[in-house]
């Protein structure tokens, strides 16, 4: 049946004239072939879980937040070591450095690096000098520590070990000068004395506190002798 509107804009056609559409879509059967190994893994997993051994299948994931840099793991603070080096090389109070941090906040890696550096420039083909310098550093610091405790000083062995190690820096500074002017005996001797006084003053000003009072020379003198011995290991005297 067909209707024609008066305005002629639309034409309506009955649905009986349209063809009916029908059909089916064949979907192939899809099977996942995981292989025999997958079946064995599934069976093993089920077997372990049924027997109460499921915890063997758990994988622990390491948290990245717990990982720390290597320097932090070894307790190495490069900024702190650099500041202590400046305190030792410039011991004058007028420069404004908080020099007591070398004594009150001792560390091991900084002094060890200084001692090893002094040992390396002292080798001159004699590798046994390295072990001698490290031995003198350890036992010389122990002697200064015991003497300081006997005199009533409130210092620890770690503090003495750090101060004595860092105070080797003046001897490292004068080492290149001795290589250049080694032929001038008078000038070379003056530089050696200056280096020893520099190192001894830097160490003594950190270790010898007000608690020693009139006993200061009793501790300053062995410190001075210790750095003379260090210098003798370098020069081969």
From Swiss-Prot:
It comes from the Eukaryota. Keywords: Golgi apparatus, Membrane, Transmembrane, Transmembrane helix. Its main location: Golgi. The chain crosses the membrane at residues 107-127, 132-152, 161-181, 189-209, 217-237. It is found in: Golgi apparatus, cis-Golgi network membrane. One of its GO terms (cellular component) is trans-Golgi network. Residues 1-106, 153-160, 210-216 are cytoplasmic. Residues 128-131, 182-188 are lumenal. It is a multi-pass membrane protein. One of its GO terms (biological process) is vesicle fusion with Golgi apparatus. Involved in the maintenance of the Golgi structure. Belongs to the YIP1 family. This is Protein YIPF4. It comes from Danio rerio (Zebrafish). The gene is yipf4.
